[in-house]
């Protein structure tokens, strides 16, 4: 699933491509992908509106239109492509926004897990999807004091806590593994067993890793590309995720993989305690 760095790069490329385009037709080929509003109402609300900006909150893309905002979650395989109206529509194209300039923004999703919903303009914070999201890790709202408070009051594994979008928005499986490794903390450690120094290391690792991942275009470990079809580069920086059996870059101990709450979890058994 694309995490915050990947979604941010999709946002940035879309921001270059679609503002100023006016929607004159919306085609929904898979109705279940439209949530919170009947698909026909979704279509009715969008026709005639102009895209003004593309924002992001956590793993959600936010399209600000003339009178409303669209929330879109890519889930596992969702992708946006800006194409000419005459280009072939593939079988994995499920939602099409047709513009007056004869281009189309197409949403493709092999798994059909992606979702879209429409809300009042700038009203995303009132939706069930977003109202409980925690702070963005690369903003001043992400503070050590609040992060430490959240960590100390849960006995869940620290990796599980990092994946809780109420604690910090946008961290997923890949970056949670990398954060724990950078902080030298075993992913199975109970969050409330961590010392203040360990919590601080995790906090700083979250900021530094997410910053670099955004700068490098995210991680392409499966099929991720941005909305211009470009691969991410941070996968070349990964130290534990997907490295099962490979030597730790610090001590040489083989990286291990376990299941933690159903998630594949990678770590160095020597460096992470």
UniProtKB/Swiss-Prot annotation:
Pfam families: Fapy_DNA_glyco, H2TH, zf-FPG_IleRS. This is Formamidopyrimidine-DNA glycosylase. It comes from Listeria innocua serovar 6a (strain ATCC BAA-680 / CLIP 11262). CDD domains: EcFpg-like_N. Monomer. GO terms for molecular function: 8-oxo-7,8-dihydroguanine DNA N-glycosylase activity; class I DNA-(apurinic or apyrimidinic site) endonuclease activity; damaged DNA binding; zinc ion binding. Keywords: DNA damage, DNA repair, DNA-binding, Glycosidase, Hydrolase, Lyase, Metal-binding, Multifunctional enzyme, Zinc, Zinc-finger. It catalyses: Hydrolysis of DNA containing ring-opened 7-methylguanine residues, releasing 2,6-diamino-4-hydroxy-5-(N-methyl)formamidopyrimidine; 2'-deoxyribonucleotide-(2'-deoxyribose 5'-phosphate)-2'-deoxyribonucleotide-DNA = a 3'-end 2'-deoxyribonucleotide-(2,3-dehydro-2,3-deoxyribose 5'-phosphate)-DNA + a 5'-end 5'-phospho-2'-deoxyribonucleoside-DNA + H(+). DNA binds at residues 92, 111. InterPro entries: DNA_glyclase/AP_lyase_DNA-bd (IPR015886), DNA_glyclase_Znf_dom_DNA_BS (IPR015887), Formamido-pyr_DNA_Glyclase (IPR020629), FPG_cat (IPR012319), MutM-like_N-ter (IPR035937), Ribosomal_uS13-like_H2TH (IPR010979), Znf_DNA_glyclase/AP_lyase (IPR000214), Znf_FPG/IleRS (IPR010663). The active site is at 2 (schiff-base intermediate with dna), 3 (proton donor), 59 (proton donor), 263 (proton donor). The keyword Repressor does not apply. One of its GO terms (biological process) is base-excision repair. SMART domains: Fapy_DNA_glyco, H2TH. Its EC number is 3.2.2.23, 4.2.99.18. Gene3D superfamilies: 1.10.8.50, MutM-like, N-terminal. Its cofactor is Zn(2+). It comes from the Bacteria. Binds 1 zinc ion per subunit. Belongs to the FPG family. A zinc finger (FPG-type) spans 239-273. Involved in base excision repair of DNA damaged by oxidation or by mutagenic agents. Acts as a DNA glycosylase that recognizes and removes damaged bases. Has a preference for oxidized purines, such as 7,8-dihydro-8-oxoguanine (8-oxoG). Has AP (apurinic/apyrimidinic) lyase activity and introduces nicks in the DNA strand. Cleaves the DNA backbone by beta-delta elimination to generate a single-strand break at the site of the removed base with both 3'- and 5'-phosphates.
């Amino acid at each position: 699933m694309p995490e915050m760095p990947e979604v941010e790069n999709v946002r940035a490329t879309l921001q270059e491509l679609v503002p100023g385009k006016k929607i004159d037709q919306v085609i929904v080929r898979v109705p279940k992908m439209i949530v919170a509003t009947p698909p026909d109402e979704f279509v009715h609300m969008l026709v005639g509106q102009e895209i003004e900006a593309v924002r992001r909150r956590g793993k959600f893309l936010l399209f600000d239109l003339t009178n409303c905002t669209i929330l879109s979650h890519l889930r596992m395989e969702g992708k946006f492509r800006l194409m000419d109206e005459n280009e072939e529509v593939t079988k994995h194209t499920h939602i099409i926004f047709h513009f007056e300039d004869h281009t189309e923004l197409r949403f493709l999703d092999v798994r059909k897990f992606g979702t879209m919903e429409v809300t009042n303009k700038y009203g995303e914070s009132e939706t069930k999807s977003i109202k409980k999201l925690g702070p963005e890790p690369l903003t001043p709202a992400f503070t050590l004091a609040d992060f430490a408070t959240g960590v100390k009051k849960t006995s869940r594994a620290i990796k599980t806590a990092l994946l809780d979008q109420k604690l910090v928005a946008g961290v997923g499986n890949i970056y949670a593994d990398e954060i724990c490794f950078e902080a030298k903390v075993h992913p199975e450690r109970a969050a409330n067993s961590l010392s203040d120094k360990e919590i601080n290391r995790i906090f700083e690792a979250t900021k530094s890793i997410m910053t670099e991942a955004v700068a490098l275009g995210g991680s392409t470990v499966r099929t991720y590309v941005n909305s211009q079809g470009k691969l991410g580069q941070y996968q070349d920086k990964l130290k534990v995720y997907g490295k099962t059996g490979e030597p730790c870059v610090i001590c040489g101990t083989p990286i291990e993989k376990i299941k933690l709450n159903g998630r594949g979890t990678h770590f160095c058994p020597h460096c992470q305690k």
